[in-house]
Amino acid sequence: MNEGLIPKRYAKALYKFALEKGETKRLYATMATLARSFDDNAQLAAAVANPFVDDSRKTSLLMTAAGADASDTVYADFLKLLTQNRRLGYARECALAYLDIYRHENRIYPVAIVSARPLDADEKARIEALLAKHLPGATMEYSYSTDPALIGGFTVTVGSERLDATVANELKQLSLKLLAK
């Protein structure tokens, strides 16, 4: 079976279950924390993939990694289902698929802004206002980072769309024009 299909099916079923329970937003935060934990800690993925670590320990690790407690029954039930079906190894992919589904259903766009230097609050506000004008009614999740290689300016990535307003890009375009002549 397709490796990407399994997590998507589980995530879709989880979203429907969370919707019935009125827990989609809470579960979104839990899954976002879980995905970040996997990204930040390679040992978590190694432990979940390790066949010598028993399932109860893996479940405990995944509860802790997601910042979940006993009151988060939807997430706990989901982990029980993954355990019963021998699919704990797909926990990260299921979390990412759930995030995608939730964002799609709620018109949430992840926005990555990379600049040559840290942006001040006024610059961030102007960029955010411009994006809000182009995507009315949508919610955006902003992440900011810096990359000195850009020389100056910034890039904005919304989903699969990218705006490149960097000095490095301008120099590259100028170079291509000069070489074409």
Q: PLM ranges: what are they?
A:
Residues 1-181:
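Elongated, mostly alpha-helical coiled-coil "stalk/stator" tethers of large membrane protein machines
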